UniProtKB/Swiss-Prot annotation:
Transmembrane spans: 8-28, 38-58
Protein name: Cardiolipin synthase A
Annotated keywords: Cell inner membrane, Cell membrane, Lipid biosynthesis, Lipid metabolism, Membrane, Phospholipid biosynthesis, Phospholipid metabolism, Repeat, Transferase, Transmembrane, Transmembrane helix
Gene3D superfamilies hit by this protein: Endonuclease Chain A
Compartment(s) where it occurs, according to its Swiss-Prot or TrEMBL record: Cell inner membrane
Keyword Lipid metabolism recorded: yes
Family assignment from sequence similarity: Belongs to the phospholipase D family. Cardiolipin synthase subfamily. ClsA sub-subfamily.
Catalytic class of the enzyme: transferase
Protein source organism: Pseudomonas entomophila (strain L48)
Molecular functions (GO terms): cardiolipin synthase activity
Catalysed reaction equations from the record: 2 a 1,2-diacyl-sn-glycero-3-phospho-(1'-sn-glycerol) = a cardiolipin + glycerol
Length: 479
């Protein structure tokens, strides 16, 4: 090709515009929200020079290859588990008890791919020391299988402690599987994984760029945090593996986070979620274990695994259903507050119904752009009657929802677009008065250590700061 030809740049410009038209049509048919489809289509039509590459990275909203992998994983699981017949046994033997509170969440049985199961033991783990003490104790007692999944694993003091423990269990003959997100754990050196592999631990990165059609899909993340030991003890919540989660970062310390420890039939669902992700990463299935018996009573639980491979926006719809079902209160804590229009409208409607609507967010930023966008949404929420609070002692990273007097949810999902549409998340929904009372006490303690945001805070914000907040909000759908 003659790059010096007077026609070369004309051909190049024409090609870019043609690709822009094709991408715009793709956006119209695939982007889930009307606002997003319009924004992408117009920008691709008129300024494709600047938007084609960002669209390849940020435009896709459905992880199509993972959908196919999930189908294959389910087929493989059905074959592998044919003798055990594990999931039908759980569903038939341990059906959910009658619950008016769960009945109020009318969409949940169909929204969640996993069943609501009774007779679970659930324990709150408040902050990092309690969380990792419980996780390490469970792994120490492992006899058969350990499944470990985190968004972030650091090669620091806590990370090395986990590494040594897993190596010791693998040397004892325990099957150990470790899955981490490639982007979230981008700072993890290859030597960390290699030491584990050399010691008999099966470790793999969850990467969304498998295959040619997914090579640009770097905007998806696997944000789940799951640990299951011998099918007897499970853990999920907000903590990752890093010293900062124990308060070692002076700029964010003390770190406020919440995990939950689980025993019971719902662990089958946590194992299923891990198995799907592991199958995507390795095309193999880990062993899935169920104990012979369960307690005769306990907490009603549903594991809600959500992500961009779902046929609908499971995470966003869960928040909507939870807020709409509230008759007395809905308390939410999240490190990021970037609701979409539907969630924001649901919060406003709950206020109009007389519901006590409270949202607790951090007073310190870990990501300044996200913090700026969250601040603007917080000011608008206050004007709508939502009570917004900033946690004062340190950084708040927990993801907790409390609805009325029985329903609570703890997991990895934030109240933002990334969790709604881009991340793979896991949340545990619980329906139990006694456990909800514990969650209430925990959150009330957090609110007692928070400062309520007022309308005056918005008026006192400098105009340049407000401009920065509005710019941050413009890009909030991809934050």
């Amino acid at each position: 090709m003659d790059y010096h030809s007077p026609y070369f740049f004309g051909y190049l410009i024409g090609l870019i515009h043609l690709l822009g038209i094709i991408a715009a049509l793709h956006a119209v048919f695939t982007v889930r929200t009307a606002q997003g489809a319009i924004a992408w289509a117009l920008s691709l039509l008129f300024i494709p020079y600047f938007t084609l590459i960002p669209y390849l990275i940020f435009g896709a909203r459905s992880f199509y290859a993972y959908i196919q992998a999930r189908r294959q994983a389910n087929q493989e699981m059905h074959v592998a588990m044919a003798n055990l017949n594990w999931r039908p046994w759980v569903e038939e033997a341990l059906t959910a008890r009658e619950s008016d509170s769960y009945a109020a969440l009318r969409a949940m049985p169909k929204l969640g791919r996993m069943p609501c199961l009774a007779n679970n033991e659930v324990k709150l783990l408040i902050d990092g020391e309690a969380t990792f003490k419980a996780i390490f104790a469970a792994i120490e007692a492992a006899r058969n299988t350990v499944l470990v999944q985190f968004f972030i694993i650091h090669d620091d003091t806590l990370g090395k402690q986990l590494q040594r423990l897993l190596l010791r269990k693998a040397a004892e003959g325990v099957q150990v599987f470790v899955l981490y997100d490639r982007v979230g754990s981008h700072a993890l050196p290859g030597s960390y994984s290699q030491v584990l592999r050399d010691g008999g631990v099966q470790i793999q990165a969850f990467a969304t760029r498998r295959g040619w059609f997914n090579r640009f899909q770097v905007n998806f993340r696997n944000h789940r945090k799951i640990v299951v030991v011998d099918g007897l003890r499970g853990f999920l919540g907000g903590h990752n593996v890093g010293d900062e989660y124990l308060g070692a970062n002076p700029h964010l310390s003390p770190w406020r986070d919440t995990h939950v420890q689980i025993a019971g039939p719902v662990l089958a669902c946590l194992q299923e979620s891990f198995a799907e992700d592991w199958y995507w990463a390795t095309r193999q299935l880990p062993p899935l274990i169920l104990p012979d018996t369960y307690p005769e009573n306990g907490v009603l639980c549903q594991a809600l695994a959500s992500g961009p491979a779902d046929p609908q926006e499971t995470c966003a719809l869960f928040f909507l259903e939870a807020i709409h079902s509230a008759t007395r209160r809905v308390w939410i804590t999240s490190p990021y507050f970037i609701p979409d229009e539907a969630i924001f409208a649901a919060l406003r409607l709950a206020v109009l119904r007389g519901v006590d609507v409270r949202v607790l967010i951090p007073s310190r930023p870990d990501h300044r752009i996200v913090y700026a966008a969250s601040s603007l949404f917080a000011f608008e929420a206050v004007r709508a009657g939502v009570r917004m609070f900033r946690y004062q002692p340190g950084f708040l990273h927990q993801k907790v929802v409390l609805v009325d007097d029985e329903v609570s949810a703890i997991g990895s999902a934030n109240l933002d677009n990334r969790s709604f549409r881009l991340n793979f998340e896991i949340t545990l929904l619980t329906v139990d008065r006694a456990f909800a009372d514990q969650v209430e006490q925990m959150l009330q303690s957090d609110f007692d250590q928070a400062r309520e945001i007022t309308a005056e805070d918005s008026r006192d914000t400098h105009r340049l700061q407000q401009l920065g907040m509005r710019i941050a909000r413009l890009i909030s759908p991809i934050l």
